[in-house]
Amino acid sequence: MFKVGEKYKIYKNITAELKEKKWVKAVAEHIPEHERFVRFRLHFTNMYGENSSYVESYTMSELTEMMKSGELVRA
């Protein structure tokens, strides 16, 4: 289903205070052998206009729900 190096877009909350959602570029970075979760590196531009990234992991059930709702798409 997911492969290391594949690019995706995730629609997620950027600022918790404003409940603002934006599309964030994501690359599948690591998938363990048991395949229960996928670790993504998320790339975005911060409020100062600088490019930044961080790592976030999602379980397979979370990713399935995100795909069904349209919050996760292939780039």
Residue positions per predicted region:
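A structural detector for beta-sheet-dominated domains
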Residues: 11, 29, 41-45
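Intrinsic-disorder/low-complexity loop/linker signature
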Residues: 6, 17, 21, 36, ...
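Short coil-to-beta transition motif at edge beta-strands of beta-rich domains
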Residues: 1-17
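Short beta-strand-centered aromatic/proline hotspots
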Residues: 16-32
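Detector for intrinsically disordered, low-structure N-terminal pre-sequences
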Residues: 3, 23-26, 37, 54, ...
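Short aromatic-glycine-enriched beta-strand elements
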Residues: 35-41
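Intrinsically disordered, low-complexity, charged/polar segments
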Residues: 44-75
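A short, structured loop/turn motif at beta-sheet edges
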Residues: 2, 31-34
